[in-house]
Swiss-Prot record:
Residues 1-25 are annotated as: Disordered. This is Large ribosomal subunit protein bL27. Keywords: Ribonucleoprotein, Ribosomal protein. Residues 7-19 have a biased composition (Polar residues). One of its GO terms (cellular component) is cytosolic large ribosomal subunit. PROSITE patterns: RIBOSOMAL_L27. Signal peptide: none annotated. Belongs to the bacterial ribosomal protein bL27 family. It comes from Micrococcus luteus (strain ATCC 4698 / DSM 20030 / JCM 1464 / CCM 169 / CCUG 5858 / IAM 1056 / NBRC 3333 / NCIMB 9278 / NCTC 2665 / VKM Ac-2230) (Micrococcus lysodeikticus).
Amino acid sequence: MAHKKAGSSSKNGRDSNPQYLGVKRYGGEDVNAGEIIVRQRGTKFHPGRNVGRGKDDTLFALSAGSVAFGQRRGRKVVDIVPAAE
């Protein structure tokens, strides 16, 4: 009987990649158009004035200005206040 006993398997041995979520530009910081402001899952923050939302709920600046966090209708929103020229 030249058989080998079955080796035991492990229930560990896997790890997920980091997601790098969170706020990337804080209130008062200056941004250019296209810069990512918040990476999130779901709409913890909603897009406000001059802010767009990607298909993965990422918020990004549509125009240059400074970031402003606030609340509207009980929701947290992110606005871009255009720089005074």
